[in-house]
Amino acid sequence: MKILSLRLKNLNSLKGEWKIDFTREPFASNGLFAITGPTGAGKTTLLDAICLALYHETPRLSNVSQSQNDLMTRDTAECLAEVEFEVKGEAYRAFWSQNRARNQPDGNLQVPRVELARCADGKILADKVKDKLELTATLTGLDYGRFTRSMLLSQGQFAAFLNAKPKERAELLEELTGTEIYGQISAMVFEQHKSARTELEKLQAQASGVTLLTPEQVQSLTASLQVLTDEEKQLITAQQQEQQSLNWLTRQDELQQEASRRQQALQQALAEEEKAQPQLAALSLAQPARNLRPHWERIAEHSAALAHIRQQIEEVNTRLQSTMALRASIRHHAAKQSAELQQQQQSLNTWLQEHDRFRQWNNEPAGWRAQFSQQTSDREHLRQWQQQLTHAEQKLNALAAITLTLTADEVATALAQHAEQRPLRQHLVALHGQIVPQQKRLAQLQVAIQNVTQEQTQRNAALNEMRQRYKEKTQQLADVKTICEQEARIKTLEAQRAQLQAGQPCPLCGSTSHPAVEAYQALEPGVNQSRLLALENEVKKLGEEGATLRGQLDAITKQLQRDENEAQSLRQDEQALTQQWQAVTASLNITLQPLDDIQPWLDAQDEHERQLRLLSQRHELQGQIAAHNQQIIQYQQQIEQRQQLLLTTLTGYALTLPQEDEEESWLATRQQEAQSWQQRQNELTALQNRIQQLTPILETLPQSDELPHCEETVVLENWRQVHEQCLALHSQQQTLQQQDVLAAQSLQKAQAQFDTALQASVFDDQQAFLAALMDEQTLTQLEQLKQNLENQRRQAQTLVTQTAETLAQHQQHRPDDGLALTVTVEQIQQELAQTHQKLRENTTSQGEIRQQLKQDADNRQQQQTLMQQIAQMTQQVEDWGYLNSLIGSKEGDKFRKFAQGLTLDNLVHLANQQLTRLHGRYLLQRKASEALEVEVVDTWQADAVRDTRTLSGGESFLVSLALALALSDLVSHKTRIDSLFLDEGFGTLDSETLDTALDALDALNASGKTIGVISHVEAMKERIPVQIKVKKINGLGYSKLESTFAVK
């Protein structure tokens, strides 16, 4: 994984938006750069931004959400962090941002917005928090914990690891490398073994508690069940006969009751028909009157229509008179306003003619303002250039004397050559510090390989002997365990053996002979159980010792392989480094050898470069002084020319040039005069528009309308609507008068038609017709009543006949079971209830017997199943017991410590590789007496072994940095790490130790990694030319980067 660029906005003290592109110069050609600035300026904020963009949290602040954000710069409303990174040649962009409501600093925090996109095509791969975190971890192979331990390194943390106690070091190893799974496995094996033993004891207790029926009990219950079954069949037959008789009698009673009800219904229907005769008589006259109803209703409709039309005529006349009066008022007011407006128009025309000169400079103030502003700006620039000229002359006079006499071009060429050779010089220093330590380390490895090979042979012999002993003891344990299990199984059947009687069959095997009962009762399981416990302890101890020995042998084998690989790697590295040395010296055109002292040559190069830089500064200052003089002359000429041009322009308008610093008030006066003239012009245009609006009113509305006696306030804008309303009402008045004539004619015609129909009817006059006339609803009800009465009488008569026939047919089908003629329904129901009760008692007895038989069968099946489960569980207990003896423990310590030891061996091996690259003097190794203790080997002091607590600051830094890089490789074993950021406190190191640390960083840079170091130490600025400078802004509490990193 490689960080390509970083963009951030408003984070902590870094206010504003900034972007650092690590793919561009100067980062592209310099893999080592420093992040410098005073304490508290915000250097670590850059690393916080990287973590925030990728994982939404930082090492200093783990909670950034909608409810809390302490990262956002105060008095701002938004913040963001964006990182572009590369994994396996593919570039991705991780983005995080948050803003406040209404985009105001006091607004509530909103939900953060996140994105993970592919840079090649801009496709968004994830935009939800959980999805983005999971996809980032999948792509990079690093979650937040591994990222902050592999790409963001802090020396202080690993110094704590170096000097920690074994228990603390074990916890740190487990946290950093994820080996906690081994402790969980160890504890799980222990718990599984314990659980299996508990389950076996439960099964054995269940098997001893199962009770079975004797054969005699089973035979007796089976015979009783057969008797009850025969009795049940007889009761069911009797129940069916009794139910049949009860059904026949019940049906006969129902038919007799129904015949009585239907005879009563017939009598009631005849009575209701007799009662309705007066209403039916009125119906005979109402039906002829129905035929005349349409003629009568037509007369009523025409009379109502005529009355409605005449009412409308009256309403329209009233509205027409009112609207015409309103139209006359509107015309009167329009004429009056037109006269007043024309008088105002004449007054405005007079004022505009008198002040016409204001119009001439209506558009000039903007140009005058620009010229006045330019004059002020030029005067300020003139003063600045004069100050810069004085400052440059002072700097030139303060420069130290130099002996070089080169032109500016020659100086630039020489400095460029030094810049090109600087990486080569740094590379030469790194190579010089690597070749000699590698030669010494190679000799040490040869001796170490011989010693480890001899130790490997000895451990193999010891392991083979221990395996033979373990095999013998395991066989003895299996034999004793079989005996103990047999004794335990015999012991669990003690309750059943106590129930055995001579001559009685065994419930399990059926035998009537029990010869071994007394022998079983005389068993003493304690002796074999003691042997079993002793053998289990001995096998467990041999297993643990064998596992430890195997682990030691594996560690020795791996150490041997690592030493051989390291020796081969060192030989290849030595050859490669020698070739690089020759290439570098050839490029520098020097003849130095790897073992020569190169410091005098380096000092001479530095002094020559310093002289060149001083001479370059002198040439640069001389050029600045000439340029400043030219600028001063140019600005003086511009000020004089613009002053003359302004004076000429204002004279043409009869205006005088304002005094210096009074331009704004002078411009304000001119602007007010121009605005005053324009305001009067706008008022004149508005008056003319208003007069034009009144003209159509006066031309359209007639003068013949009579004015109302009392004038009212009118709205002139509605004049057209009022006029159109007058015309519409007049047209409506004429239409209604025509409708009135037609309605009167229709009424006369309807009256004549009714009179003719009345003469042809059964009625003598109109009064007789009205007396017989009924409303349609009443007439329909009477007709429906007559029809209902007739239908009700016929239906009742039919039902009486049908019921009599049904009763006669039922009596012909009397049951043939000897049913007496005098028996009642109650007697049959009583007999049927007795039969039901006997059946219930029979069924209950059968159920009890069947349940006893089923329970006995279930118990026998349960006992057989339990014996099978006991056998299976016994095997599981043995399997888990063996595994528990090897790696199991209650707290998970046994397997965890073994895994942590292997992890520490791997970490020490990787750290030694890093130490060889950084500085060939020191190596790390595990203490033989302590499981997780490490010590330092000083190869320059005859491989003297030292405790890590005795290291100096510089030595501790080198070892801690090697451990940090090794742990980075260990944590990120599936992901290549090409970028490292060291948040290290170099300020506590002395000058000599600081030089050692910087040499180590140079050597690390030569390995191809991009390294960023946070520091505020001045010596860092000289040794690391590429820097990201974080500067405080005095008095504001904010910081900033250089302008090249600002996003505009």
UniProtKB/Swiss-Prot annotation:
PANTHER family: ABC TRANSPORTER ABCH.3. ATP binds at G37, P38, T39, G40, A41, G42, K43, T44. It comes from the Bacteria. It comes from Escherichia coli (strain K12). GO terms for molecular function: 3'-5'-DNA exonuclease activity; ATP binding; ATP hydrolysis activity; DNA exonuclease activity; double-stranded DNA endonuclease activity; single-stranded DNA endodeoxyribonuclease activity. Heterodimer of SbcC and SbcD. SbcCD cleaves DNA hairpin structures. These structures can inhibit DNA replication and are intermediates in certain DNA recombination reactions. The complex acts as a 3'->5' double strand exonuclease that can open hairpins. It also has a 5' single-strand endonuclease activity. One of its GO terms (cellular component) is DNA repair complex. Keywords: ATP-binding, Coiled coil, DNA recombination, DNA replication, Endonuclease, Exonuclease, Hydrolase, Nuclease, Nucleotide-binding. It holds the Pfam family AAA_23. The gene is sbcC. This is Nuclease SbcCD subunit C. Belongs to the SMC family. SbcC subfamily. Signal peptide: none annotated. Residues 191-402, 438-502, 528-648, 671-695, 770-880 form a coiled coil. One of its GO terms (biological process) is double-strand break repair.
